[in-house]
Amino acid sequence: MAAVTTTETASQSRDKGENAWAYKKDVAWYRKDLSEDTIGETRAILQQYSKIPPERVIDHIKKVRDKAWEVYPYGSVGMFGFLTLNMPYMPEYVEILDRLRTGDQKFIDVGCCFGQEIRKLVFDGVPSQNLYGMDLHQGFMDIGYDLFCDKQKLKSTFIAADIFDSSNPAFAKIAGTIDIIHAGSFFHLFSWDDQVKVAKQIINFLKPQSGSMLVGKHAGDTNPGHKSRPGRLGSRYRHNGETWKKMWEQIGEETDTKWEVKVNELADDEYFKDGKQYGDWDSETTRRLQFCVRRL
């Protein structure tokens, strides 16, 4: 059975309060219908790994999604974005599988949501005991067991934690032990300064050796800069390829480390196209940034 480390945070314990409006199902980022195109290759995982009958897959996903919506109404939850896997479409995925299948290397998905990328790795032959997931919301990771029907067989470790809480004892346990980190739809949640803090924490998790790497994908912008967050306080920084590399130059200087940074600016996918109706959340300049940051 999977191990779970729980850390209660202030943001988790607060009630919906000022963000109660976001939990309503008439917002632009809550999609009522679910198409086969959206399910994509996740259907194979749900049918073959989770043993869910084909005719039950759509209803199963929608019920789990609505349960997750009550935990926190992220756009990736409302728009079924969690069904779109990131890592299989990265140039490094074959390398990642080869390294993890040996059983000698460890992986963590930071901001793992339901742990869908972890299930894909297991589906593709990676030993689950060497895989870790981390998310602010314990509820999402619990719901992951409901989505994939695997609480009794998955041996991965899940950690509920605030990435900015460096005093978390769970961080000390994994410090310097991780070979590969995935961060999908994560960095774009924060300001430039907070992204730097996140990166430094990620460096702390990674083995301090050549080849340790971070991969992921997040929203970017052809006009990089801090973007407003409708209905919420603060702003988040959206990168283009150049600013993403510049940030990692800064991180390298401040941590006395060196990194090879590869980044691809990709055209809109369905999720971001639909997101245009969010106003400031997404615009015609929104792009996806797919990246690999490898320690030299």
Swiss-Prot record:
Gene3D superfamilies: Vaccinia Virus protein VP39. InterPro entries: Meroterpenoid_MTases (IPR051654), Methyltransf_25 (IPR041698), SAM-dependent_MTases_sf (IPR029063). Phomoidrides A and B (also known as CP-225,917 and CP-263,114) are potent inhibitors of Ras farnesyltransferase and squalene synthase. CP-225,917 and CP-263,114 inhibit Ras farnesyl transferase from rat brain with IC(50) values of 6 uM and 20 uoM, respectively. CP-225,917 inhibits squalene synthase with an IC(50) value of 43 uM and CP-263,114 with an IC(50) of 160 uM. O-methyltransferase; part of the gene cluster that mediates the biosynthesis of the antihypercholesterolemic agents phomoidrides which are dimeric anhydrides. Within the pathway, tstE catalyzes the acetalization reaction that converts phomoidride A to phomoidride B. The pathway begins with the highly reducing polyketide synthase tstA that catalyzes the formation of a C12-fatty acyl-ACP, starting from one acetate and 5 malonate units. The hydrolase tstM is involved in the release of the C12-fatty acyl chain from phiA. Residues 216-235 are annotated as: Disordered. It holds the Pfam family Methyltransf_25. Homodimer. One of its GO terms (molecular function) is methyltransferase activity. It is an enzyme of class 2 (transferase). This is O-methyltransferase tstE. It comes from Talaromyces stipitatus (strain ATCC 10500 / CBS 375.48 / QM 6759 / NRRL 1006). S-adenosyl-L-methionine binds at D135, L136, D162, I163. Pathway: Secondary metabolite biosynthesis. Residues 226-235 have a biased composition (Basic residues). PANTHER family: METHYLTRANSFERASE AUSD (PTHR35897:SF1). The keyword Nucleus does not apply. Its EC number is 2.1.3.-. It catalyses: phomoidride A + S-adenosyl-L-methionine = (-)-phomoidride B + methanol + S-adenosyl-L-homocysteine + H(+). GO terms for biological process: methylation. The keyword Methyltransferase applies. Belongs to the class I-like SAM-binding methyltransferase superfamily. Keywords: Methyltransferase, S-adenosyl-L-methionine, Transferase.
